[in-house]
Amino acid sequence: MWARDKCSVPQLEMDSRYTSATGIGDLNQLSAAIPATRVEVSVSCRNLLDRDTFSKSDPICVLYTQAVGNKEWREFGRTEVIDNTLNPDFVRKFILDYFFEERENLRFDLYDVDSKSPNLSKHDFLGQVFCTLGEIVGSQGSRLEKPIVGIPGRKCGTIILTAEELNCCRDAVLMQFCANKLDKKDFFGKSDPFLVFYRSNEDGSFTICHKTEVVKNTLNPVWQAFKISVRALCNGDYDRTIKVEVYDWDRDGSHDFIGEFTTSYRELARGQSQFNVYEVVNPKKKGKKKKYTNSGTVTLLSFLVETEVSFLDYIKGGTQINFTVAIDFTASNGNPAQPTSLHYMNPYQLNAYGMALKAVGEIVQDYDSDKMFPALGFGAKLPPDGRISHEFALNGNPQNPYCDGIEGVMEAYYRSLKSVQLYGPTNFAPVINHVARYASSVKDGSQYFVLLIVTDGVISDMAQTKESIVNASKLPMSIIIVGVGPAEFDAMVELDGDDVRVSSRGKYAERDIVQFVPFRDYIDRSGNHILSMARLAKDVLAEIPEQFLSYMRARGIKPSPAPPPYTPPTHVLQTQI
Protein backbone atom coordinates (compact mmCIF):
# COMPACT_ATOMS: atom_id res chain seq x y z
CA MET A 1 0.00 0.00 0.00
CA TRP A 2 1.09 3.48 -0.72
CA ALA A 3 1.00 6.84 0.97
CA ARG A 4 -2.31 8.49 0.29
CA ASP A 5 -2.71 10.35 -3.01
CA LYS A 6 -5.16 13.19 -2.74
CA CYS A 7 -8.43 12.64 -4.58
CA SER A 8 -10.51 15.68 -5.28
CA VAL A 9 -14.16 14.87 -4.66
CA PRO A 10 -16.35 16.82 -7.09
CA GLN A 11 -20.11 17.08 -6.63
CA LEU A 12 -21.43 13.93 -8.30
CA GLU A 13 -24.07 14.44 -10.95
CA MET A 14 -25.93 11.87 -13.00
CA ASP A 15 -24.72 12.90 -16.45
CA SER A 16 -23.11 11.35 -19.51
CA ARG A 17 -19.92 10.56 -17.62
CA TYR A 18 -21.61 7.59 -15.94
CA THR A 19 -22.37 4.40 -17.81
CA SER A 20 -23.38 0.99 -16.54
CA ALA A 21 -20.63 -1.57 -16.96
CA THR A 22 -21.63 -4.79 -18.69
CA GLY A 23 -19.79 -7.88 -19.76
CA ILE A 24 -17.98 -8.72 -16.51
CA GLY A 25 -20.22 -11.35 -14.94
CA ASP A 26 -24.00 -11.05 -14.92
CA LEU A 27 -25.29 -8.52 -12.44
CA ASN A 28 -28.83 -9.89 -12.75
CA GLN A 29 -27.50 -12.99 -11.01
CA LEU A 30 -25.83 -11.10 -8.15
CA SER A 31 -28.77 -11.44 -5.79
CA ALA A 32 -28.81 -15.19 -6.32
CA ALA A 33 -25.09 -15.33 -5.53
CA ILE A 34 -25.44 -13.58 -2.19
CA PRO A 35 -25.20 -16.15 0.60
CA ALA A 36 -28.02 -16.75 3.03
CA THR A 37 -28.33 -14.94 6.27
CA ARG A 38 -27.25 -17.03 9.25
CA VAL A 39 -29.33 -17.96 12.25
CA GLU A 40 -28.36 -19.29 15.64
CA VAL A 41 -30.61 -22.12 16.85
CA SER A 42 -30.86 -22.70 20.61
CA VAL A 43 -32.18 -25.95 22.10
CA SER A 44 -34.01 -26.57 25.37
CA CYS A 45 -35.99 -29.63 26.46
CA ARG A 46 -38.62 -30.30 29.10
CA ASN A 47 -39.62 -33.55 30.79
CA LEU A 48 -37.14 -35.84 29.07
CA LEU A 49 -37.28 -39.58 29.73
CA ASP A 50 -35.30 -40.61 32.79
CA ARG A 51 -32.99 -43.47 31.79
CA ASP A 52 -30.72 -43.44 34.87
CA THR A 53 -31.54 -45.62 37.87
CA PHE A 54 -30.07 -43.56 40.70
CA SER A 55 -30.08 -40.07 39.17
CA LYS A 56 -31.60 -38.13 36.28
CA SER A 57 -30.46 -38.37 32.65
CA ASP A 58 -27.34 -36.60 31.37
CA PRO A 59 -28.68 -35.32 28.03
CA ILE A 60 -26.95 -34.24 24.82
CA CYS A 61 -28.61 -33.04 21.60
CA VAL A 62 -27.24 -34.01 18.17
CA LEU A 63 -28.35 -32.12 15.04
CA TYR A 64 -28.55 -33.79 11.62
CA THR A 65 -29.21 -32.05 8.29
CA GLN A 66 -30.21 -33.26 4.82
CA ALA A 67 -28.77 -32.04 1.52
CA VAL A 68 -31.33 -30.88 -1.08
CA GLY A 69 -32.74 -33.88 -2.97
CA ASN A 70 -30.84 -36.32 -0.75
CA LYS A 71 -32.43 -38.59 1.85
CA GLU A 72 -29.19 -39.17 3.76
CA TRP A 73 -28.91 -37.48 7.17
CA ARG A 74 -25.52 -36.06 8.09
CA GLU A 75 -24.42 -35.05 11.56
CA PHE A 76 -24.07 -31.27 11.76
CA GLY A 77 -23.04 -30.82 15.38
CA ARG A 78 -23.60 -31.62 19.06
CA THR A 79 -24.42 -29.59 22.13
CA GLU A 80 -22.54 -30.05 25.38
CA VAL A 81 -23.71 -32.70 27.87
CA ILE A 82 -25.66 -31.38 30.85
CA ASP A 83 -25.46 -33.60 33.93
CA ASN A 84 -28.38 -34.87 35.94
CA THR A 85 -31.39 -33.03 34.46
CA LEU A 86 -34.58 -33.76 32.54
CA ASN A 87 -34.99 -30.07 31.62
CA PRO A 88 -31.77 -29.05 29.85
CA ASP A 89 -31.11 -25.60 28.40
CA PHE A 90 -28.11 -26.24 26.18
CA VAL A 91 -25.53 -23.46 25.97
CA ARG A 92 -23.87 -24.54 22.73
CA LYS A 93 -25.84 -23.25 19.73
CA PHE A 94 -26.12 -24.43 16.14
CA ILE A 95 -25.34 -21.76 13.52
CA LEU A 96 -27.09 -22.49 10.22
CA ASP A 97 -27.30 -20.77 6.83
CA TYR A 98 -30.90 -19.71 6.21
CA PHE A 99 -32.54 -19.58 2.78
CA PHE A 100 -36.21 -18.61 2.59
CA GLU A 101 -36.44 -20.34 -0.78
CA GLU A 102 -35.16 -23.75 0.38
CA ARG A 103 -36.69 -26.47 2.50
CA GLU A 104 -33.98 -27.10 5.09
CA ASN A 105 -34.79 -30.36 6.88
CA LEU A 106 -33.47 -30.79 10.43
CA ARG A 107 -33.43 -33.72 12.85
CA PHE A 108 -32.64 -33.32 16.54
CA ASP A 109 -31.70 -36.57 18.35
CA LEU A 110 -31.43 -36.68 22.14
CA TYR A 111 -29.30 -39.10 24.14
CA ASP A 112 -28.58 -39.84 27.78
CA VAL A 113 -24.78 -39.94 27.97
CA ASP A 114 -23.43 -42.89 29.96
CA SER A 115 -19.69 -42.66 29.20
CA LYS A 116 -17.07 -40.47 27.55
CA SER A 117 -17.39 -42.38 24.25
CA PRO A 118 -18.24 -40.18 21.22
CA ASN A 119 -20.00 -43.21 19.69
CA LEU A 120 -23.72 -42.48 20.05
CA SER A 121 -24.65 -46.18 20.01
CA LYS A 122 -23.00 -46.44 23.45
CA HIS A 123 -25.59 -44.06 24.94
CA ASP A 124 -29.34 -44.33 25.63
CA PHE A 125 -31.63 -42.86 22.97
CA LEU A 126 -34.16 -40.38 24.45
CA GLY A 127 -36.12 -39.55 21.28
CA GLN A 128 -35.99 -37.22 18.29
CA VAL A 129 -37.72 -34.33 16.55
CA PHE A 130 -38.05 -33.57 12.83
CA CYS A 131 -38.72 -30.05 11.54
CA THR A 132 -37.54 -27.50 8.99
CA LEU A 133 -35.53 -24.37 9.69
CA GLY A 134 -38.43 -22.44 8.15
CA GLU A 135 -40.78 -23.94 10.75
CA ILE A 136 -38.62 -22.58 13.58
CA VAL A 137 -38.16 -19.16 11.99
CA GLY A 138 -41.84 -18.94 10.97
CA SER A 139 -43.21 -19.77 14.44
CA GLN A 140 -44.38 -16.95 16.69
CA GLY A 141 -41.30 -15.19 18.02
CA SER A 142 -39.19 -17.72 16.04
CA ARG A 143 -39.80 -20.17 18.91
CA LEU A 144 -41.03 -23.68 18.09
CA GLU A 145 -42.21 -26.26 20.63
CA LYS A 146 -42.66 -29.86 19.45
CA PRO A 147 -43.20 -33.18 21.21
CA ILE A 148 -40.18 -35.49 21.21
CA VAL A 149 -41.00 -38.83 19.53
CA GLY A 150 -39.24 -42.06 18.65
CA ILE A 151 -39.88 -44.41 21.57
CA PRO A 152 -43.22 -46.21 21.06
CA GLY A 153 -45.66 -46.00 23.94
CA ARG A 154 -43.61 -43.46 25.90
CA LYS A 155 -44.03 -39.72 26.42
CA CYS A 156 -40.59 -38.39 25.61
CA GLY A 157 -41.07 -34.74 26.60
CA THR A 158 -40.88 -31.53 24.59
CA ILE A 159 -38.16 -29.73 22.64
CA ILE A 160 -38.03 -25.91 22.46
CA LEU A 161 -36.15 -24.49 19.47
CA THR A 162 -35.48 -20.77 19.05
CA ALA A 163 -33.85 -19.01 16.09
CA GLU A 164 -31.98 -15.70 16.24
CA GLU A 165 -30.50 -13.96 13.21
CA LEU A 166 -26.80 -13.23 13.67
CA ASN A 167 -26.08 -9.51 13.86
CA CYS A 168 -23.22 -9.50 11.35
CA CYS A 169 -25.67 -10.71 8.70
CA ARG A 170 -27.85 -7.62 9.10
CA ASP A 171 -25.11 -5.06 8.48
CA ALA A 172 -24.59 -3.18 5.24
CA VAL A 173 -21.75 -0.82 4.40
CA LEU A 174 -21.84 2.41 2.43
CA MET A 175 -18.47 2.85 0.68
CA GLN A 176 -16.93 5.30 -1.75
CA PHE A 177 -13.69 5.00 -3.72
CA CYS A 178 -11.58 7.18 -5.99
CA ALA A 179 -8.46 6.45 -8.05
CA ASN A 180 -5.32 8.31 -9.11
CA LYS A 181 -3.09 8.06 -12.16
CA LEU A 182 -4.67 4.95 -13.65
CA ASP A 183 -3.13 3.59 -16.86
CA LYS A 184 -4.34 5.21 -20.07
CA LYS A 185 -6.00 2.51 -22.19
CA ASP A 186 -7.85 4.46 -24.89
CA PHE A 187 -5.95 5.56 -28.03
CA PHE A 188 -7.84 8.82 -28.55
CA GLY A 189 -8.68 9.70 -24.96
CA LYS A 190 -8.24 8.79 -21.33
CA SER A 191 -9.63 5.61 -19.76
CA ASP A 192 -13.27 5.03 -18.76
CA PRO A 193 -12.65 3.18 -15.48
CA PHE A 194 -14.92 1.06 -13.31
CA LEU A 195 -14.36 -1.34 -10.38
CA VAL A 196 -15.49 -4.95 -9.99
CA PHE A 197 -15.59 -6.43 -6.47
CA TYR A 198 -15.31 -10.17 -5.73
CA ARG A 199 -15.55 -12.05 -2.46
CA SER A 200 -13.43 -15.17 -2.04
CA ASN A 201 -15.03 -18.56 -1.46
CA GLU A 202 -13.77 -21.30 0.81
CA ASP A 203 -12.51 -23.30 -2.20
CA GLY A 204 -10.29 -20.40 -3.31
CA SER A 205 -12.55 -19.26 -6.16
CA PHE A 206 -14.07 -15.77 -6.38
CA THR A 207 -17.70 -14.65 -6.78
CA ILE A 208 -18.63 -11.24 -8.18
CA CYS A 209 -20.54 -9.16 -5.64
CA HIS A 210 -20.55 -5.56 -6.92
CA LYS A 211 -19.76 -3.45 -9.96
CA THR A 212 -19.44 0.34 -9.88
CA GLU A 213 -20.66 2.67 -12.59
CA VAL A 214 -18.24 3.79 -15.32
CA VAL A 215 -16.71 7.26 -15.01
CA LYS A 216 -15.91 8.48 -18.53
CA ASN A 217 -12.66 9.89 -19.87
CA THR A 218 -10.52 10.25 -16.74
CA LEU A 219 -7.48 8.68 -15.10
CA ASN A 220 -8.54 10.07 -11.70
CA PRO A 221 -12.14 8.86 -11.26
CA VAL A 222 -14.35 9.37 -8.23
CA TRP A 223 -17.04 6.70 -8.11
CA GLN A 224 -20.41 7.19 -6.50
CA ALA A 225 -20.89 5.78 -3.01
CA PHE A 226 -22.61 2.37 -3.01
CA LYS A 227 -24.26 0.19 -0.40
CA ILE A 228 -23.62 -3.56 -0.11
CA SER A 229 -24.55 -6.08 2.58
CA VAL A 230 -21.73 -7.57 4.64
CA ARG A 231 -23.08 -11.00 3.63
CA ALA A 232 -22.58 -10.17 -0.05
CA LEU A 233 -19.17 -8.60 0.51
CA CYS A 234 -17.53 -11.26 2.69
CA ASN A 235 -20.23 -13.65 3.99
CA GLY A 236 -19.79 -12.14 7.44
CA ASP A 237 -16.11 -13.21 7.62
CA TYR A 238 -14.19 -10.00 8.31
CA ASP A 239 -10.82 -11.49 7.32
CA ARG A 240 -11.96 -13.10 4.05
CA THR A 241 -10.10 -11.81 0.98
CA ILE A 242 -11.93 -9.26 -1.17
CA LYS A 243 -10.48 -8.83 -4.66
CA VAL A 244 -11.05 -5.62 -6.63
CA GLU A 245 -10.35 -5.45 -10.37
CA VAL A 246 -10.06 -2.16 -12.27
CA TYR A 247 -11.21 -2.05 -15.91
CA ASP A 248 -11.38 0.43 -18.76
CA TRP A 249 -14.88 0.27 -20.24
CA ASP A 250 -15.27 -0.45 -23.96
CA ARG A 251 -18.52 -0.17 -25.87
CA ASP A 252 -18.13 -3.64 -27.43
CA GLY A 253 -17.90 -5.29 -24.00
CA SER A 254 -14.21 -6.26 -24.33
CA HIS A 255 -13.21 -4.16 -21.33
CA ASP A 256 -9.46 -3.65 -20.84
CA PHE A 257 -7.96 -4.93 -17.59
CA ILE A 258 -5.99 -2.16 -15.82
CA GLY A 259 -5.03 -4.00 -12.64
CA GLU A 260 -6.19 -5.39 -9.32
CA PHE A 261 -5.68 -5.32 -5.56
CA THR A 262 -6.93 -7.26 -2.55
CA THR A 263 -8.27 -6.18 0.81
CA SER A 264 -10.64 -7.44 3.53
CA TYR A 265 -13.60 -6.11 5.46
CA ARG A 266 -11.38 -5.64 8.51
CA GLU A 267 -8.95 -3.47 6.52
CA LEU A 268 -11.72 -1.44 4.91
CA ALA A 269 -13.34 -0.87 8.30
CA ARG A 270 -10.31 1.24 9.29
CA GLY A 271 -11.89 3.89 7.08
CA GLN A 272 -10.16 6.71 5.24
CA SER A 273 -6.47 6.42 6.18
CA GLN A 274 -3.07 5.51 4.81
CA PHE A 275 -4.06 1.86 5.31
CA ASN A 276 -6.74 2.11 2.64
CA VAL A 277 -4.74 3.35 -0.33
CA TYR A 278 -4.10 0.43 -2.69
CA GLU A 279 -1.64 -0.13 -5.52
CA VAL A 280 -3.44 -1.28 -8.66
CA VAL A 281 -1.16 -3.99 -10.06
CA ASN A 282 -1.29 -5.72 -13.45
CA PRO A 283 0.48 -9.08 -12.88
CA LYS A 284 1.44 -9.43 -16.57
CA LYS A 285 3.14 -6.03 -16.63
CA LYS A 286 4.85 -6.76 -13.32
CA GLY A 287 6.26 -9.98 -14.75
CA LYS A 288 7.54 -8.35 -17.95
CA LYS A 289 8.83 -4.94 -16.87
CA LYS A 290 11.51 -4.56 -14.20
CA LYS A 291 10.78 -0.88 -13.61
CA TYR A 292 7.00 -1.40 -13.35
CA THR A 293 5.59 -0.28 -9.99
CA ASN A 294 1.83 -0.03 -10.46
CA SER A 295 -1.00 1.03 -12.77
CA GLY A 296 -2.28 3.69 -10.40
CA THR A 297 -3.81 3.71 -6.93
CA VAL A 298 -7.33 3.32 -5.53
CA THR A 299 -8.29 5.10 -2.30
CA LEU A 300 -11.17 4.44 0.07
CA LEU A 301 -12.91 7.78 0.70
CA SER A 302 -15.58 6.69 3.17
CA PHE A 303 -16.83 3.57 4.98
CA LEU A 304 -20.07 3.65 6.98
CA VAL A 305 -21.73 0.62 8.61
CA GLU A 306 -25.54 0.51 8.78
CA THR A 307 -27.66 -2.16 10.45
CA GLU A 308 -30.62 -2.94 8.24
CA VAL A 309 -34.03 -4.30 9.13
CA SER A 310 -34.27 -7.82 7.70
CA PHE A 311 -37.00 -10.11 6.39
CA LEU A 312 -36.62 -12.22 9.53
CA ASP A 313 -37.28 -9.19 11.77
CA TYR A 314 -40.79 -8.98 10.29
CA ILE A 315 -41.39 -12.72 10.50
CA LYS A 316 -40.23 -12.76 14.12
CA GLY A 317 -42.51 -9.79 14.82
CA GLY A 318 -45.49 -11.84 13.67
CA THR A 319 -45.99 -10.95 9.98
CA GLN A 320 -47.82 -13.83 8.29
CA ILE A 321 -47.28 -14.96 4.69
CA ASN A 322 -50.67 -15.80 3.14
CA PHE A 323 -50.38 -18.26 0.27
CA THR A 324 -53.01 -18.64 -2.49
CA VAL A 325 -52.83 -21.00 -5.48
CA ALA A 326 -54.55 -20.59 -8.86
CA ILE A 327 -54.58 -23.46 -11.37
CA ASP A 328 -55.14 -23.34 -15.12
CA PHE A 329 -58.08 -25.57 -16.16
CA THR A 330 -58.12 -24.59 -19.85
CA ALA A 331 -58.63 -27.22 -22.56
CA SER A 332 -55.10 -26.78 -23.96
CA ASN A 333 -53.88 -28.91 -21.03
CA GLY A 334 -55.44 -31.97 -22.72
CA ASN A 335 -58.00 -34.48 -21.49
CA PRO A 336 -57.08 -35.37 -17.86
CA ALA A 337 -57.98 -39.01 -18.57
CA GLN A 338 -55.18 -39.26 -21.16
CA PRO A 339 -51.53 -39.82 -20.13
CA THR A 340 -50.47 -37.02 -22.52
CA SER A 341 -52.47 -34.44 -20.51
CA LEU A 342 -50.61 -32.05 -18.23
CA HIS A 343 -53.43 -32.75 -15.72
CA TYR A 344 -53.12 -36.55 -15.98
CA MET A 345 -53.36 -38.16 -12.55
CA ASN A 346 -50.62 -40.78 -12.58
CA PRO A 347 -51.07 -42.99 -9.50
CA TYR A 348 -47.29 -43.35 -9.16
CA GLN A 349 -46.01 -39.79 -9.52
CA LEU A 350 -47.14 -36.17 -9.40
CA ASN A 351 -47.92 -34.33 -12.61
CA ALA A 352 -46.24 -30.98 -13.33
CA TYR A 353 -49.09 -29.06 -11.66
CA GLY A 354 -48.83 -31.18 -8.53
CA MET A 355 -45.05 -30.82 -8.39
CA ALA A 356 -45.22 -27.02 -8.70
CA LEU A 357 -47.91 -26.78 -6.00
CA LYS A 358 -46.04 -29.02 -3.59
CA ALA A 359 -42.59 -27.52 -4.24
CA VAL A 360 -43.62 -23.94 -3.51
CA GLY A 361 -46.39 -24.65 -0.99
CA GLU A 362 -44.36 -26.84 1.34
CA ILE A 363 -41.91 -23.99 1.90
CA VAL A 364 -44.36 -21.09 2.15
CA GLN A 365 -46.64 -22.98 4.58
CA ASP A 366 -44.02 -22.66 7.32
CA TYR A 367 -44.75 -18.91 7.47
CA ASP A 368 -48.54 -19.24 7.77
CA SER A 369 -49.73 -20.05 11.29
CA ASP A 370 -53.12 -21.58 10.45
CA LYS A 371 -51.89 -23.50 7.35
CA MET A 372 -55.21 -22.80 5.58
CA PHE A 373 -54.75 -21.90 1.91
CA PRO A 374 -57.28 -20.55 -0.62
CA ALA A 375 -57.11 -22.64 -3.81
CA LEU A 376 -58.66 -21.30 -7.02
CA GLY A 377 -59.09 -22.48 -10.59
CA PHE A 378 -59.66 -20.62 -13.85
CA GLY A 379 -60.69 -21.42 -17.43
CA ALA A 380 -63.22 -24.22 -16.75
CA LYS A 381 -66.94 -24.89 -17.18
CA LEU A 382 -68.49 -25.61 -13.79
CA PRO A 383 -71.31 -28.01 -12.94
CA PRO A 384 -74.26 -28.11 -13.00
CA ASP A 385 -74.94 -25.51 -15.74
CA GLY A 386 -71.60 -25.31 -17.59
CA ARG A 387 -70.93 -21.72 -16.53
CA ILE A 388 -67.41 -20.59 -17.53
CA SER A 389 -65.41 -19.33 -14.54
CA HIS A 390 -62.01 -17.70 -14.15
CA GLU A 391 -62.12 -17.59 -10.36
CA PHE A 392 -63.67 -20.70 -8.78
CA ALA A 393 -62.91 -22.47 -5.50
CA LEU A 394 -61.27 -25.86 -5.98
CA ASN A 395 -63.10 -27.19 -2.92
CA GLY A 396 -66.46 -26.16 -4.42
CA ASN A 397 -67.19 -23.61 -1.68
CA PRO A 398 -66.93 -20.03 -3.04
CA GLN A 399 -67.65 -18.58 0.44
CA ASN A 400 -64.77 -20.53 1.98
CA PRO A 401 -62.14 -21.57 -0.62
CA TYR A 402 -59.61 -22.51 2.10
CA CYS A 403 -57.92 -25.92 2.08
CA ASP A 404 -56.18 -27.53 5.05
CA GLY A 405 -52.46 -27.48 4.28
CA ILE A 406 -50.79 -28.29 0.99
CA GLU A 407 -52.21 -31.82 1.12
CA GLY A 408 -55.69 -30.28 1.30
CA VAL A 409 -54.90 -28.16 -1.77
CA MET A 410 -53.74 -31.27 -3.66
CA GLU A 411 -56.92 -33.17 -2.74
CA ALA A 412 -59.15 -30.27 -3.85
CA TYR A 413 -57.21 -30.03 -7.14
CA TYR A 414 -57.69 -33.74 -7.88
CA ARG A 415 -61.40 -33.58 -6.98
CA SER A 416 -61.92 -30.58 -9.29
CA LEU A 417 -60.39 -32.44 -12.22
CA LYS A 418 -63.17 -35.03 -11.89
CA SER A 419 -66.02 -32.50 -11.75
CA VAL A 420 -65.21 -29.53 -14.03
CA GLN A 421 -64.84 -29.39 -17.82
CA LEU A 422 -61.59 -27.92 -19.13
CA TYR A 423 -62.40 -24.97 -21.37
CA GLY A 424 -60.87 -21.48 -21.72
CA PRO A 425 -59.64 -18.81 -22.30
CA THR A 426 -56.51 -18.27 -20.14
CA ASN A 427 -57.39 -15.22 -18.04
CA PHE A 428 -55.14 -14.24 -15.10
CA ALA A 429 -56.68 -10.91 -14.06
CA PRO A 430 -59.62 -12.39 -12.05
CA VAL A 431 -57.40 -14.46 -9.70
CA ILE A 432 -54.88 -11.60 -9.31
CA ASN A 433 -57.75 -9.24 -8.42
CA HIS A 434 -59.15 -11.85 -6.00
CA VAL A 435 -55.94 -11.83 -3.92
CA ALA A 436 -55.53 -8.06 -4.36
CA ARG A 437 -58.93 -7.48 -2.70
CA TYR A 438 -57.66 -9.18 0.46
CA ALA A 439 -54.22 -7.56 0.28
CA SER A 440 -55.74 -4.07 -0.07
CA SER A 441 -57.40 -4.42 3.34
CA VAL A 442 -54.05 -4.96 5.14
CA LYS A 443 -52.02 -1.78 5.55
CA ASP A 444 -50.12 -2.39 8.80
CA GLY A 445 -47.55 -4.95 7.61
CA SER A 446 -49.14 -7.79 9.58
CA GLN A 447 -49.73 -9.87 6.43
CA TYR A 448 -48.11 -10.37 3.04
CA PHE A 449 -49.79 -12.28 0.21
CA VAL A 450 -48.15 -14.66 -2.27
CA LEU A 451 -50.17 -15.88 -5.29
CA LEU A 452 -48.90 -18.93 -7.19
CA ILE A 453 -50.38 -19.27 -10.70
CA VAL A 454 -49.64 -22.55 -12.51
CA THR A 455 -50.49 -22.39 -16.22
CA ASP A 456 -49.80 -24.18 -19.49
CA GLY A 457 -50.40 -21.53 -22.05
CA VAL A 458 -50.52 -18.25 -23.78
CA ILE A 459 -52.30 -15.60 -21.75
CA SER A 460 -55.58 -14.29 -23.23
CA ASP A 461 -56.18 -11.14 -21.16
CA MET A 462 -52.74 -9.51 -21.32
CA ALA A 463 -54.00 -5.91 -21.08
CA GLN A 464 -56.22 -6.64 -18.05
CA THR A 465 -53.48 -8.71 -16.39
CA LYS A 466 -50.94 -5.90 -16.79
CA GLU A 467 -53.41 -3.48 -15.23
CA SER A 468 -54.00 -5.90 -12.34
CA ILE A 469 -50.25 -6.26 -11.76
CA VAL A 470 -49.68 -2.48 -11.81
CA ASN A 471 -52.47 -2.06 -9.23
CA ALA A 472 -51.20 -4.98 -7.12
CA SER A 473 -47.66 -3.55 -7.05
CA LYS A 474 -48.91 -0.99 -4.50
CA LEU A 475 -50.16 -3.80 -2.23
CA PRO A 476 -48.44 -6.29 0.10
CA MET A 477 -48.35 -9.09 -2.47
CA SER A 478 -46.13 -11.02 -4.87
CA ILE A 479 -47.08 -13.20 -7.84
CA ILE A 480 -45.29 -16.38 -8.89
CA ILE A 481 -46.13 -17.82 -12.33
CA VAL A 482 -44.97 -21.35 -13.18
CA GLY A 483 -45.39 -22.34 -16.83
CA VAL A 484 -45.86 -26.08 -17.44
CA GLY A 485 -45.76 -27.94 -20.76
CA PRO A 486 -44.03 -27.20 -24.07
CA ALA A 487 -45.65 -23.84 -24.97
CA GLU A 488 -43.69 -20.68 -25.70
CA PHE A 489 -44.01 -18.35 -22.72
CA ASP A 490 -42.81 -15.07 -24.26
CA ALA A 491 -45.74 -13.12 -22.80
CA MET A 492 -44.96 -14.40 -19.30
CA VAL A 493 -41.40 -13.11 -19.53
CA GLU A 494 -42.89 -9.68 -20.27
CA LEU A 495 -44.88 -9.86 -17.01
CA ASP A 496 -41.73 -10.70 -15.04
CA GLY A 497 -40.46 -7.13 -14.75
CA ASP A 498 -36.78 -7.90 -14.15
CA ASP A 499 -35.64 -6.00 -17.26
CA VAL A 500 -38.54 -3.64 -18.00
CA ARG A 501 -41.08 -2.67 -15.35
CA VAL A 502 -44.65 -3.75 -16.25
CA SER A 503 -46.86 -0.87 -17.37
CA SER A 504 -50.54 -0.31 -18.16
CA ARG A 505 -52.17 2.81 -19.63
CA GLY A 506 -49.01 4.84 -19.09
CA LYS A 507 -48.64 3.79 -15.43
CA TYR A 508 -45.66 1.70 -14.36
CA ALA A 509 -45.69 -0.90 -11.59
CA GLU A 510 -44.47 0.63 -8.33
CA ARG A 511 -42.17 -2.37 -7.81
CA ASP A 512 -41.38 -5.70 -9.46
CA ILE A 513 -43.77 -8.26 -7.93
CA VAL A 514 -43.86 -11.02 -10.59
CA GLN A 515 -41.51 -13.98 -10.91
CA PHE A 516 -42.01 -16.33 -13.89
CA VAL A 517 -40.25 -19.65 -14.52
CA PRO A 518 -40.91 -22.44 -17.05
CA PHE A 519 -41.13 -25.74 -15.20
CA ARG A 520 -39.35 -27.63 -18.00
CA ASP A 521 -36.10 -25.87 -17.07
CA TYR A 522 -36.12 -27.67 -13.71
CA ILE A 523 -36.88 -31.26 -14.70
CA ASP A 524 -34.03 -33.44 -13.48
CA ARG A 525 -32.82 -35.70 -16.30
CA SER A 526 -32.24 -38.59 -13.93
CA GLY A 527 -35.91 -38.50 -12.93
CA ASN A 528 -35.26 -37.22 -9.40
CA HIS A 529 -38.51 -35.30 -8.85
CA ILE A 530 -37.48 -34.19 -5.35
CA LEU A 531 -34.48 -32.43 -6.88
CA SER A 532 -36.66 -30.90 -9.65
CA MET A 533 -39.05 -29.50 -7.05
CA ALA A 534 -36.24 -28.16 -4.86
CA ARG A 535 -34.66 -26.35 -7.82
CA LEU A 536 -38.00 -24.88 -8.86
CA ALA A 537 -38.81 -23.64 -5.35
CA LYS A 538 -35.34 -22.12 -4.97
CA ASP A 539 -35.72 -20.00 -8.10
CA VAL A 540 -39.34 -18.89 -7.73
CA LEU A 541 -39.08 -18.03 -4.04
CA ALA A 542 -35.62 -16.41 -4.02
CA GLU A 543 -37.03 -12.95 -4.85
CA ILE A 544 -39.86 -12.99 -2.28
CA PRO A 545 -37.89 -11.62 0.73
CA GLU A 546 -36.60 -8.63 -1.28
CA GLN A 547 -40.06 -7.96 -2.79
CA PHE A 548 -41.50 -8.16 0.73
CA LEU A 549 -38.89 -5.70 2.05
CA SER A 550 -39.38 -3.30 -0.88
CA TYR A 551 -43.07 -3.00 0.06
CA MET A 552 -42.37 -2.49 3.77
CA ARG A 553 -39.66 0.12 3.09
CA ALA A 554 -41.80 2.02 0.58
CA ARG A 555 -44.61 2.23 3.14
CA GLY A 556 -42.33 3.02 6.08
CA ILE A 557 -43.59 -0.04 7.96
CA LYS A 558 -41.27 -1.19 10.74
CA PRO A 559 -41.31 -4.74 12.15
CA SER A 560 -43.50 -5.33 15.20
CA PRO A 561 -41.53 -6.04 18.37
CA ALA A 562 -40.85 -9.74 18.79
CA PRO A 563 -42.38 -11.45 21.84
CA PRO A 564 -39.99 -11.50 24.82
CA PRO A 565 -37.39 -14.22 24.33
CA TYR A 566 -37.68 -17.42 26.32
CA THR A 567 -35.33 -17.16 29.31
CA PRO A 568 -34.67 -20.54 30.89
CA PRO A 569 -33.79 -20.84 34.57
CA THR A 570 -30.06 -21.13 35.23
CA HIS A 571 -28.94 -24.38 36.76
CA VAL A 572 -26.96 -27.60 36.34
CA LEU A 573 -23.49 -28.80 35.63
CA GLN A 574 -22.19 -29.08 32.05
CA THR A 575 -19.73 -31.52 30.53
CA GLN A 576 -18.76 -32.32 26.95
CA ILE A 577 -18.24 -35.36 24.79
From Swiss-Prot:
Read off the SMART domains from this record: C2 (SM00239), VWA (SM00327)
Q: What is the purpose of this protein?
A: Probable calcium-dependent phospholipid-binding protein that may play a role in calcium-mediated intracellular processes.
**PROSITE patterns assigned to the protein according to its UniProt record, in alphabetical order:** C2 (PS50004), VWFA (PS50234)
Domain C2 span(s) in chain numbering: 19-146, 155-278
Q: Which residues bind Ca(2+) 3?
A: D114, S117, K122, D124
Keywords of this entry: Calcium, Metal-binding, Phosphoprotein, Repeat
Write out the residues that bind Ca(2+) 1: D52, D58, D112, D114
Cofactor(s) essential for the protein: Ca(2+)
Ranges for domain VWFA: 322-523
Gene expressing this chain: Cpne8
- The species is Mus musculus (Mouse)
Name of the protein described by the UniProt record = Copine-8
- Per the similarity annotation, which family is this? Belongs to the copine family.
Q: Domain of life of the organism in this record?
A: Eukaryota
Where Ca(2+) 4 binds, per the record, is at D186, D192, D248, D250
Cofactor note, please?
Binds 3 Ca(2+) ions per C2 domain.
